[in-house]
Amino acid sequence: MIEVRGLKKTFDGFAALDGADLSVPRGAVYGLVGPNGAGKTTLLRHLTGVYHQDSGSVTFDGQPVWENAGVKARIASIPDDWFYFMQAGLRDMMRFYRGLYPKFDQERFEKLREVFALDEKRPLRRMSKGQQKQAAFWLALCTMPDYLILDEPVDGLDPVMRRQVWSLILQDVAERGTTVLVSSHNLRELEDVCDHVGVMSRGKL
């Protein structure tokens, strides 16, 4: 279970988060919507342990995420600005992920080759945004996460690939109890896949 209580974060006097509260039960698909500047990305960066809150708490199954390697190993994240090494290809990043995530499933990586038809040796920086997003999903799903944190996840994907990606995610939810938190501007799409949808405004939910 993801629990956020009274989360506050200020940047140069601006309250990006102003007492945000959130509860996401295990196996749920929770959608997050709101205008630009509402605090969605800032909230997700706290959930993945990138930011540390000024006050409040962020816990996964009762454990804080900040500087907690055990919790972070259970979380896969696809931010809008996905990180990759500049000279790396997909297979290079696979080796990197395999070293980071104890549950990385090599067999699943091979099977998902049928879904994501990408050149694994081509540098990721030479791929389109949509291809990079496919690579991010390919790797994230192979970490066998308990929690999947997604920021505008299918932006840049064609309609067919969007359906395939959501099918894979929802299969993990059904079979493994994966908990998903997804931020998007596309309310219609969230309504199609989410159990719950929360609206962020001025740093609050």
What is each of the regions a protein language model found here?
Residues 2, 9-201, 205:
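ABC transporter nucleotide-binding domains
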